[in-house]
């Protein structure tokens, strides 16, 4: 999935913070009504969105879409930032649509 950003509009940030997890932490299962950006600072985060599993390490980030389930699938310890936001400024594109957009 690719996203285009309309820079004339700003996202509405509803919640953001820095989190340091305890050892053997697993991210809880949830479905958000907002976009979420995770930025991993240290350690590893084992995160699943729907059927896709990701191993995030220091310097990695992931952008989660609203309405999709996400959860941890393996215990770990990490430090990360998270930003929850609502936005009308983003448009999602499936990978097969990219050639049409480029024309």
Regions from the PLM with identified roles:
Residues 12-100:
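N-terminal regulatory/effector-sensing and dimerization cores
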